[in-house]
Amino acid sequence: MPTPSYPGVYVEETSGGVRPLTVASTSTAAFVGLAERGPVSATRVTNWTEFQRLYGSFSSEGLLAHSVFQYFNNGGRQCYVVRVTRAEARTASVSLRNRAEEPVPGLTFSAMSPGAWGNTLVLSIEDGTEDPGNTFKVSVRRQADPAVVPPGLGATDPVEEFDNLTTDPGSSRFVSSVLDAESEFIRAVILEQNTAVQRGLLRGGGAPELPLDTPVTFQINVDGDGFQDVTLPEEVGTVTSPEAAATAVQDAVRALTRKKESTDAAAFTSFTCEAEGEGEEVRLVLRSGTAAPTSSVRVQPAEFDGAADRLKLSLAAGGRPEDGSALRRPVNADLVQIGDAAVQGDVTAVAPGIDGTTEVPEAMFAEALGRLDNITDFSLLAVPGIGTPAMMNAGMAYCANRPLRDVFYIGETRREDITPEQAAVFRRGLTAPNSYGALYFPWVKALDPTGQSRDPIMLPPSGYIAGVYARIDASRGVWKAPAGTEASLNGVVGVATELSDVQHGTLNPINVDVIRRFPQAGVVVFGARTVSSDPQWQYVPVRRTAIMLRVSIYYGIQWAVFEPNDEPLWSQLRLSIGSFMTTLYRQGAFQGASASQAFFVKCDEETTTQTDIDNGVVNVLVGFAPLKPAEFVVVKISQKAGMASG
């Protein structure tokens, strides 16, 4: 607080006492299904363009792409995608030799996910830009259809480029780490047999300028020992032969003493400098006396002396260092197609990508749900096109058994279920119905986005429905039923089955939510029931409102953990949660003419006994009066007797 020292006004910031709670998102969906390509782990996607970039577009690999497109088309903002692959799917890869004199397989580049799509990737390897002797650059291109275009022809411009990569795991540019973090197409693995080392060297950037003006001094760093001054004898001023200059450099460096005990003395005692090449192509080549991954040679000018530049050994003069591990880099290669068994040359192994042809069993889709276990910011789940009772049972069970029970499953009947009787049979096939799922019937008709069919195609409704959920949540709130004339479906031309009111009346009582077409409203969702038989949780908005409250309160009161368990804490909890509930009530989230009728928050000595306190437990009781949709609007019309005329 301020310390008053003069007459005037002092302003101090204080805590308001209320810790605000944030309303949890309720409209982020997760989709599980087959895709042309893409990661198999749960991956966030924020728009259709991003989905296409990661997973490909519409394909025969399933209806996942169609459903995600319609999710965004109907109001969805972001979603997670879990790609399922066939059991026999394989990842395309190619292994390249290292740069040793007796080369061995050095690196394996592979597509980032299984499938034949990886066979369209084309790689080019070249020296890195900043340090060409030790690093390399990888360019990734997409090939046209490999079935009709010869390898290496028709490749597009690079879709990705990664420069200055290294095989050193300790480097920030380690190839595997960089590709894992940044590439949308490829991964890389250093093979175990890639252990080649050499004596670290420095190759001059040109023929030395002889004779040299004396005195001749430059600085050298061998094996990371630190830079030291190297002074050549005065006789070097008369030397015109590169071989003689090389001998002078070698003798001077060998006379140095290591600065660090950790440096191998042989780095200096066995140091060599040779003149390699002839005529204008002659170069001085300096080599450390040790052969190890960290072996290296660096030269820089000494102060006020340009000898390093005249000897062409400095980086500015074109000197090119190659460290001991430089041989582990992949050989330079141009347009190597991943997965193409016909590729030869420096390629040591190829594995083509395979999609597989067998039908994916439902169990694989159910197992894939587990990849969402660590994702906490989604609240809707769908497995488009896999409409079976077993799949819906698995989906609802997954939602109900998540630790926070924070997800709602959007189910659908089978494509071939086109009659109300078949939909009823499907509903009766749900062996473990609960309030964490809703069943929608029938499928919808839409124009084929690929243009392959002139007639409308059949699509599962779950992607559309998830988009409607998101749209209604944003415009009206999660407590508004995602149904009615407001819940129109964008991107449809009809439904698989046109139902009458009588037929609809046979499905609504057994909690099958129907999609219908009306003359004025178009195709709309006209049902908002969960598949639960519990009247308390019969309606979709009631369950989803409860999910929203649970998640919001859970994350909003984390601050209370380890606070002193007494009335001050209880009062803060009542105040924070009560303020949150009041805000929702004012937005129309609950039933009741007053806040006291709409909800209550209780946290006191009745909810938290001394035994609870001794066990470290504080109990908060929150109740709310949910809004339930008006399914049946009954209008009674009667005649009013006319007044007698006088």
Language-model features: locations:
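Structured, hydrophobic secondary-structure cores that serve as assembly/anchoring elements
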Residues: 1-103, 107-112, 131-133, 141-144, ...
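Acidic, small/polar residue-enriched beta-strand/turn segments
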Residues: 144-182, 259-338
